[in-house]
UniProtKB/Swiss-Prot annotation:
It comes from the Bacteria. The gene is queF. Pathway: tRNA modification; tRNA-queuosine biosynthesis. HAMAP family: QueF_type1. The active site is at C49, D56. Transmembrane segments: none annotated. This is NADPH-dependent 7-cyano-7-deazaguanine reductase. Its EC number is 1.7.1.13. It comes from Leptospira interrogans serogroup Icterohaemorrhagiae serovar Lai (strain 56601).
Amino acid sequence: MKTNHPETYDGRQDHIPSLQTPEIESFTNVYEGKDYTIDFTVPEFTAVCPKTGLPDFGVILVSYIPNKRCIELKSFKEYILSYRNVGIFHEFLVNKILEDVIKSIDPKYLKVIGDYNARGGIKTIVTREYKKP
């Protein structure tokens, strides 16, 4: 969609799906075949607002039911830290994390929530879920 707004950001984040990030490592799930949920929270997430260049602060929540592999947390921490200086919209970050985790561990179920601090009086919460077909 074309707009007459010179401040538009259409097309400026097209590279996000292919953005190079550290590998999310994994380990064998020795309880494969059992459905259990793993939840973790990144309470001090930061990235950069692509419009203002100012930092965005928020909480990232990840919840998944593993299949054959589980996320190795140190590598996930390094993966998350790689966004610290990246200009990325909230919506795209949640989608990118979800797709990268799917590539890494092929979970049975995955939910990623980006719960961002209010900016300009607006609080943003972005959620995406995946269920293995």
